[in-house]
């Protein structure tokens, strides 16, 4: 909804049956909606109308690989607007059934933010891989982010923020840290992530 990019979305559903609900998937950082294909197919088989989209700066919602990880001037504000647009589309396609919003990792934080403003528009929410930090750490992260933007601009990259967030998880797996072992216990999932160009980029 920034007037520049076409937001890529995907739907999974069985048109021959009566849907028992809508499931909107909100993906996490450094991934894209079609990674959820196997799960979404299962949910569609169970009777759900499943929908999701690639956030701005992710997957196919970019105009080129160089835009991966770039959030633009409004950043997460646009992500929330896109989530609401997708919700409206799904509600129109499958009205009068329970509406559930599922967020994974970064997506869980977006869903939490969405619920603050529009919680009455959904019937339920599933938060996977979410978390909470102490207020002093949150303030430190914000200060670091603002300092980085002042120095490098909004599309800059902060190694310090990486270490404070995602890259810091690797410390728990020192023998295999570079493979992103913290993401999954399944070796094939880790290998797929390393070989996927849509998952190997730096966040602005």
Each language-model region and where it sits:
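The serine-hydrolase catalytic nucleophile loop
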Residues: 29-40
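Conserved alpha/beta-hydrolase
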Residues: 40-66
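Alpha/beta-hydrolase active-site loop
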Residues: 71-91
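Alpha/beta-hydrolase fold nucleophile elbow
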Residues: 94-105
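Glycine-rich nucleophile elbow surrounding the catalytic serine of serine-hydrolase chemistry
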Residues: 103-113
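Alpha/beta-hydrolase-fold enzymes
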Residues: 111-198
